[in-house]
Amino acid sequence: MLDLEKITLNVREIALRAGAFLRNERSGFDRSKVEKKNAHDYVSYVDKESERRIVAQLRELLPEAGFIAEEGSGSLTTENYCWLVDPLDGTTNFIHNNAPYCVSIALRNKEELLVGVVYEVCRDELYWTYKGAPSYLNNKEIHVSDVSDMDEAFVRSEEHTS
């Protein structure tokens, strides 16, 4: 049986290190090294290097797990445990030096999500949870609203443009 609390603690550290790498690379980012995956999707050397670092650390943490990663590390897997990794979620924002962009890491067992960590780099916000635990933002427990009437609800969304 996996110790999800311990795994989550490690994944939080991995996400923070990846975020520090993104922050450092953003200051000297070379836009000429950006590739187009398609008309509205980009990839940079920063995406690829961030993924390489994250995957290496996750392999050490849970060697038996497979990977599905945004930039192609690993492949679709039949393994029970599988890491889902987006090493730079918001590449277009990153390229244009706009917030937000983040590091997203999850662990699943078959179809069940076990761990989720999202680090929003620009705001220094670390969201995390694991199966059976509450959700947290920077170590403060957070909750969804109990408002069920949409007329009384406050809903916020950010447009994702290319």
Please describe what each predicted stretch is.
Residues 79-83, 103, 114:
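Short loop/turn microsegments at loop-to-beta-strand junctions
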Residues 21, 104-106:
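Residues within alpha-helical transmembrane segments of multi-pass membrane proteins, especially transporters
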Residues 106-162:
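Acidic beta-strand-loop-alpha-helix segment within the catalytic core
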Residues 1-88:
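N-terminal subdomain of lithium-sensitive/metallo-dependent phosphomonoesterases centered on the IMPase/IPPase/PAP
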Residues 98-102:
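Conserved structural elements of the adenylate-forming
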Residues 55, 94-97, 128:
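Short, function-defining helix-loop hinge/capping sites that tune catalysis or transport
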